[in-house]
Structure formats: C-alpha cells, structure tokens
Amino acid sequence: MASSGVTVSAAGSASEASEVPDNVGDWLRGVFRFATDRNDFRRNLILNLGLFAAGVWLARNLSDIDLMAPQPGV
C-alpha cells in the first residue's frame, strides 16, 4: 500500500513537471504543492542549498562589520 502511494505521488510530480501553468493561480498552486510535499527530495535539496547560499552570503557580507568600533555621532 505504501509503495502504491509513492508511485501515485511520483506520477503526480512527473505530470506536474511537464505541464505549463496558464496563469498565476496555477503557478502559485504548483509552488504551494512543491513547498508542502513532505516526500519531495528536490524540495529538500533546493531548500537546503538555498539556506546554505543565504548563510554564505550573510557570512561574507557581514564579516567586515566591526561591532566594537566607535560609532559616528555617539
């Protein structure tokens, strides 16, 4: 029974990938389904890579700020 559920969700993902949304509502619905699918490896991979990239960007751009330096006008 579990394998049939996986097959159905995999088939649903494959058919979704081949469809082209005709309006913004369909696109948003697809994004919502993509973000809330708990068994989606692609979602986890994209989310983890995005969070990693955001962390790297923050670390690179905030590392040169000296919080102990005297502030102007204080």
Swiss-Prot record:
* UniProt xrefs under InterPro entries: TOMM6
Subcellular compartments: Mitochondrion outer membrane
Residues annotated as region Disordered? 1-21
Specify the superkingdom: Eukaryota
One of the protein's GO biological processes: protein transport
Task: Indicate the principal place this protein occupies in or around the cell.
Answer: mitochondrion
Q: Which UniProt keywords apply?
A: Acetylation, Membrane, Mitochondrion, Mitochondrion outer membrane, Protein transport, Transport
| Pfam families, sorted | TOM6p (PF15184)
N-acetylalanine carried by residues: 2
Biased segments, Low complexity type: 1-20
Q: Which GO terms describe its cellular component?
A: mitochondrial outer membrane translocase complex; mitochondrion
Family named by the database record: Belongs to the Tom6 family.
How does the annotation summarize its subunit structure? Answer: Forms part of the preprotein translocase complex of the outer mitochondrial membrane (TOM complex) which consists of at least 7 different proteins (TOMM5, TOMM6, TOMM7, TOMM20, TOMM22, TOMM40 and TOMM70).
Q: What is this protein called in UniProt?
A: Mitochondrial import receptor subunit TOM6 homolog
Organism per entry:
Mus musculus
Q: What is the lineage of its organism?
A: Eukaryota, Metazoa, Chordata, Craniata, Vertebrata
